[in-house]
């Protein structure tokens, strides 16, 4: 989505709805008005309670807010966690392959054990430098990786690998 600061509240709602696949007739829009310090009023401007989420709330300043159920929030957080896990595993896989392992699964197992050890000490997974982790594993367990220097020394001049 482009910069929101220059768009009207309805343009923002339409753009987000379009992005989420919500047709205009299925948009649920509320208007939020200030009654007093402890009271605000939500008025249904468009839509109905069975319409797809999110529901949109436009305040007195024209700022758009969204509202959705706890179920939707939990599903979103679970999906975000799954994406984060997949991303972490892809980064770990890349870090392992860059060091040219003899057996990927052996290095993966050692790396996961080390990650679990660091997490048990309070380090968050997202803060682990995976390239450094695999470099350390390579230094501790060189037998798990192909030694390119040694391989290059064995190659005779004009010989192909």
From Swiss-Prot:
Entry's family note: Belongs to the UPF0763 family.
InterPro entries: UPF0763
A Pfam family this chain is assigned to: DUF2603
Organism: Campylobacter lari (strain RM2100 / D67 / ATCC BAA-1060)
Name of the protein: UPF0763 protein Cla_1130
Taxonomy, superkingdom: Bacteria
